[in-house]
Amino acid sequence: MPAPTDHQLFDLGDLPLQSGATLRGAQLAYKTHGSLNADRSNVIVHPTWFSAWHDANEWSIGPGLACDPEKYFIVVPNQLNNGLSSSPSTTPPPFDGPHFPPITFHDQVEAQHRLLTQQWGIESVELVLGSSMGAGQTYQWAVSHPEMVKRAAPIVGSSRTSEHNQVFLKSLRATLTLDPAFRGGEYSPDARPTAGMRAFARIYAGWGLSQAFYWEREYRSMGYSSLEDFLVGFWEGFWLDDDRDPNNLLAMLWTWEHGDVGRTPGFDGDTEAALRSIRCPLVAMPARTDLYFPPEDEQWASQFIPQGEVRVIDTIWGHFGGLGMNAADNAFVDRTLQELLDRPV
């Protein structure tokens, strides 16, 4: 599926990064749903997940849903590195391709904060929500701008990337970069590391969905006739898309791997202290069978958040239980979001 084109670009100008580099002429791609009201008090922020573009969030946006564009002004910022916002594939030298500087969740949120405050003069946000890497950005919003965020809902994500999760991410990086066609990230557009990307897809297939999903052969409900049909048609088909640039994927992997709200300036690596600083009600929604972000990760974090709560998505769809793939899981997420939005703050 090609990258969407129904977005706008916000000029960030020069964006200082936590690495010490400055991303000059940076741009943030975004899409909005609904209208901003007169006092700018109806804002929802919904960041994107790994490899996803803004359209991947649209399952949770619509009339009658919690994220209702008839009530709210919903901003969906594309994270840096995803190919629409400033990324290795879109940036000229000296930060082109493999030379693109590392981006943290803090950097992502500061870019989004510029968009909200400079483009629309927004001072408060009713809800920040996001899935997977979007959940990491949600936690970061609540820590970086507690005066601004009224509610937060991280879905199938975490406040700190666990070492077990890092093992998965390192395996993806290794398999992609070991393809001879990768050439240290200086690959030709006409000779992309497709062998590495096929292996990347096969590794992802074993982590993104649960053991029970495969035991029940749930892929048949998606229209695939066999395991091999699913691996080729769904997984390889997704990752071999021409618009999914390998350097962009590696840059997003770095952000994911180094996710930790404790790295927010002022907390000196103390994740627990960063979580204690969150002022708003925060309802985390891990999936029971998620191999990346198991419920235990969120239960650990929740004990430090003054108004923290965990609602587990009871699903066999693993990580995909929070990505809009299954109607029952979507309904659970939407009900939980509605309850959170109805809560006085």
Q: Model-found features: residue ranges?
A:
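Alpha/beta-hydrolase-fold enzymes
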Residues: P154-W239
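N-terminal cap/lid subdomain of alpha/beta-hydrolase-fold enzymes
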Residues: K31-P93
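Conserved acidic catalytic loop of the alpha/beta-hydrolase fold
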Residues: F95, H99, H106-E126, Q140, ...
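Catalytic-loop region of hydrolases
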Residues: M1-V43
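Conserved hydrolase catalytic core segment
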Residues: E123-F168
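Short beta-strand/loop motif that positions the catalytic acidic residue
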Residues: I278, A284-P286
